[in-house]
Structures are given as C-alpha cells and as structure tokens.
From Swiss-Prot:
This is T-box transcription factor TBX2. Keywords: Developmental protein, DNA-binding, Nucleus, Phosphoprotein, Transcription, Transcription regulation. It is found in: Nucleus. It comes from Mus musculus. The keyword Hydrolase does not apply.
Amino acid sequence: MREPALAASAMAYHPFHAPRPADFPMSAFLAAAQPSFFPALALPPGALGKPLPDPGLAGAAAAAAAAAAAAEAGLHVSALGPHPPAAHLRSLKSLEPEDEVEDDPKVTLEAKELWDQFHKLGTEMVITKSGRRMFPPFKVRVSGLDKKAKYILLMDIVAADDCRYKFHNSRWMVAGKADPEMPKRMYIHPDSPATGEQWMAKPVAFHKLKLTNNISDKHGFTILNSMHKYQPRFHIVRANDILKLPYSTFRTYVFPETDFIAVTAYQNDKITQLKIDNNPFAKGFRDTGNGRREKRKQLTLPTLRLYEEHCKPERDGAESDASSCDPPPAREPPPSPSAAPSPLRLHRARAEEKPGAADSDPEPERTGEERSAAPLGRSPSRDASPARLTEPERSRERRSPERCSKEPTEGGGDGPFSLRSLEKERPEARRKDEGRKDVGEGKEPSLAPLVVQTDSASPLGAGHLPGLAFSSHLHGQQFFGPLGAGQPLFLHPGQFAMGPGAFSAMGMGHLLASVAGGSGSSGGAGPGTAAGLDAGGLGPAASAASTAAPFPFHLSQHMLASQGIPMPTFGGLFPYPYTYMAAAAAAASALPATSAAAAAAAAAGSLSRSPFLGSARPRLRFSPYQIPVTIPPSTSLLTTGLAAEGSKGGNSREPSPLPELALRKVGGPSRGALSPSGSAKEAASELQSIQRLVSGLESQRALSPGRESPK
C-alpha cells in the first residue's frame, strides 16, 4: 500500500514517499538513461548495494532494521512531520564536507487557482511521440534559501497509483491494472546550479519539460503511459555540482492539485475548453485562427489544401500543447486555366512575375516604341525608357513574343524582306491579318511565355530569335520567349497534348534547326508576315549585321530528347504528322537563305495543285524520311522548326511537291554573290505569290465552313 501524503499545509510542502525502494538509482544522473535514486536519502558508495526495505510494506521491526542499517552506514536519521521516524529518512549533511548552511526552503505553487480548476475536472496532459509540453506549466516560487549557497532544482513525474483509467460517462474510472512503468527520468532545471539569491529572485518554471510516450526516446523527455495518473514532484538539492546529486540532500515537494492523467487526445471537452481559454498557444482547437480544426473545415478549397501541405504543424511550440504552424510562404499566383498539367518542369522567370511581363490584358494605347517589352532578366530602368535606344540598338534588342506578334521584323525595315513594305503593297493582307482573332492588332498572349533551359549561355545574337506563334487553334498563345544569355527555355507541355490539327499552320523562327556556320542573317517567323499561311509562314531575315554564332545544333538533339520531346535528325520540333502547309516551310529549311523563299513559294504552289492537299480537308500523309543536304559553312539558313521535306522517299504515296526550280537550286552551287537588288525583287515576288496562294486557300475554307480540320 502506498502511504498517503499529508493534507496540504499553507506552504503546500510535503515530503513525498516513494513507491519502491529502488525508485531512483544513482545511474539516473551518471548515465544518459537517467534511472532513479531514493529521493529522501543520501547514500554512501558502500551503501548503494544494500537493499532498502519499503516502509509501506514492512512492519515496525523492518522499519527499525532499516534505521539500524542506515546508522551503520554513518547516516543520521531525522523524522519529518508526524510520520514514524523510519518512514522518512533524511541526511542532515552530505558526505562531501560543506560549511554549515542555515536554510529553511519554502515552496509555493504558481497559478494555484488555475491548477485547482483543472484538478476539479480531472487534469489531462497530452503526450506525443515527439514530446509535448505541459499546460498549465509547472511553476513554483522558492523562498528561505541561503543567498550564497548553490542549489540544484529538479523535478520528476511518478505514477500516482497502479491503476489504468478510462473516460466513461463524462468521468474518469478505473479500467484495470497499470501497465509496466516507463524508465524514470529526472528533469534538471537548465539554470542549475545557481545561488539561492538567483532562485528566489523569480519564479522557477519547468515549462520546457516535455512528455512523451516513445519508449526509445533519445531527447531526455519524460516517458509516460497513456491513460495513467501521474504526480509531478519538485526537488531542491544543495550542491554546487550536478555530479554530487547522488550524495546530496534532497528536499521533495509535492502539490496534489498538479496530478494529471496522461492522454494522447483530450477526453473531457471541459478540459479542452479550459485550456483554450487559458493557453494562448492552443490554436489547434480554436474555431477562429489558424488551427487544425479551422483548416480541416476549409480543406475543400484546393488553395487551402496546398497551404496545408506546406504548413506542417509545429506541435511543440513555445509553451504549447497544441499544434502551431509557421506562416505560409509567399506563393506564386495560380497558373492560367489554359495551362495543362504535365510531367515536364515549368519554370517561369522572375521577370514574368512583374506586371509588365505577366499582365495579359490588352494595352491598345501603348505605342510601337513602348511595345519593346523587357527581355527576361533586364532591369526595370532599362525597360522604362525605350525611347532612348537608337534604331540599331532596337534592332539588336531581344524582343518578346508580344513584340514579335506585332512587328516581327523590327530592325529589318531596310532589308529586302521588309514586312512593312510588303504590307503596303498588299493592303488585302493587312485587312486579312486584322480580321484574324489569334494574331489581331494589340492582341497579347493569355499565357506568359516559357523558356527552355540550355546547358550553356545562349550563343544567339540579339535578333536571332524574334519569336514563335501558333495558329488559331491555340488562340494566340505565345509559345516561346526570347532566348537570352543564361535564361531557361522550357517548352510548354500543354501545347504538345493536342491533335495534329492544332499544328495545321505553324511558323517558327530560327529556333532549333540551325546549322553551325559562319556569319549571316538568321531567319525568323511571325504570324504577321506577308507569307501568313494561317499561322505565319516564313518570316524575313533579322538584322543582317548580326554576326554571332548560330544556335547550337546539339540543343535540339540532347536537350529536347532529355525532356521527352521527339526530334528528327536534321532538326525540327515536330517530326510528323503535320498538315499541308508544313511542307512549304519544311522545303525552305534545307535551302540557303537566298533561295529559301523561292523554294517555299514553289513548293506551296505545287501543294495547291496537288489533288490531295488542295482539298478543303487536308490530309496527313507525309513521309518522315529525310534526305540530308550538304550545305557549305558559309551559308546561313532561313529555317523553321519543322522537319526538312526536301524530297519524298521512293515508297511515298504522293509525288514530290518540290518543283524542278527548287531542286535545281538545291543541287546547284551556293549563290552567295547575288546582288542585293536582284535578291530583294526575287524574294518580294515569291512572297507575293505565296500570299496569293494563302488568299485562295482561305477562300476555299470560307466556302466550306462545315468542314473541320482533322483532330
């Protein structure tokens, strides 16, 4: 039988009787496991092996024998309170020689009224595997200590009885015998040892003590069994070194109102409400705030579900018995609904988060000079003053797809392939372009452009890549951003999840099919060119003064293959199938710059005469086989991102759409010595013929509106 503690006195001072003789062995302080020793007795080394009888189980004779054994060991026996002299053994002096210190410690419990409220309802303390602090925290105020002597203050938690409890019908009741006890651990106050003056200056708080149910805990937390009742104890030891604890005098203080039942979740709703009302850190149970209960109610929203994933509860916050979580990190705005999910990584540059780059609202009031949007990674100060740039500087600026969709050939107005001069000659092309929804005047992309990551700095010149736009099937969404030095370039995977009809008319600039060679102008494409072909056809050359090395060929083979994008040998983005207008651009991809436009025009003309391709419903029969073309390093290519269709294989179902003119130019020598005036006239006439072809095709499409392109 456990001897009951005395009734609470005015100072709530009780020498606590330990339930077993070997409650705290000396190894509790010398080993990491922290076992136990007998708190009311200071034993010499020779007496550690002697068994101490339990006074609660022994009779008067056993108690007298224990007193005699202690006397043989050289200890003084003193009686405290009305208990029998053998019931509470106390050493007046430690074995270590110390000066006589006159002290009479008195201990009072802080927040006693709050403890009384919990005690009336049955205090519960939550225990977790990671450790949970107590609330109310165990705080005491000590007085009567010697100001100069040093003291060690510590506490432990022992089983109040040998019963297991359950909460039934709104009350706690005994449910059986207690489970085996967990290892005993003492919690030494972190400020120990300290002088009596320091201890008496302020309340002594053990708020950092944590309770756990993890038997293999390595952090020194107090290990408890769930649904068992426990009693905290407070000890004062006069010693100047923690190593002297086993040989020092312990004064133990017990406050009956601090007993509690360890639980893994609160059982009594009244206890829960009392903790909410008094614990400022109990946000996990409030209906208002950032607690778990509130978030559980609102988790139907996907944004809050994402917030829950990134905001893991910090269950052991300062003086907290409930979970608390860090504030949510700054999150990017949600992506556009048109962006399809994909296993490919989508990286948006920081510049796209700025209003000037990410805002997709139309801005018709902006002039052409202001439409030179900031390339990725440029400072706002440079973007804010486009008027300061001279004409050559503007031609070397890396332009965004928004700029290119409006003026794809800025900086090339004086060249032979000037778009503006051709549109003046062809007013019907301007009217047609204005009526188109996907590349209308002032139309800006509804999705911020994405970029592709290269292994090294991009070798493109300032005007090498004007941009890339898709057909009306994609509703004018921009596909690529300008390739800047060191800027990532990733392909939007949502565009690849479409049927072949989505790519019925697609214009790509000098993108992935460039052949490394000498200096020369690089080709471009844009939806506003005269060779508009439903998605922008072949664009004129960019600034001829650009002498930077062309785009590396290994990008198309290695980088895109690593991302799961199919890539043909010669270059290009979509091997096959593609629709009827692709062959005109593909034919030009294998020709020198001086004859590319003529070949494209002739190929397009043959396509219009083809019985299969001239119909309103285009066929998807193209041979994927390609014939390599030998190109001298001195020539540059006016390329598109499509696979080269220079000639058809022997097993192709269709005749070759490339006329003799194009074949003669391919087989002939490089015509690098043509006069600029002759090449300009030839290119202008060929582009005009392509324009007439497009007008005829669109008229055929208008005559059969019910026919749709194959999906």
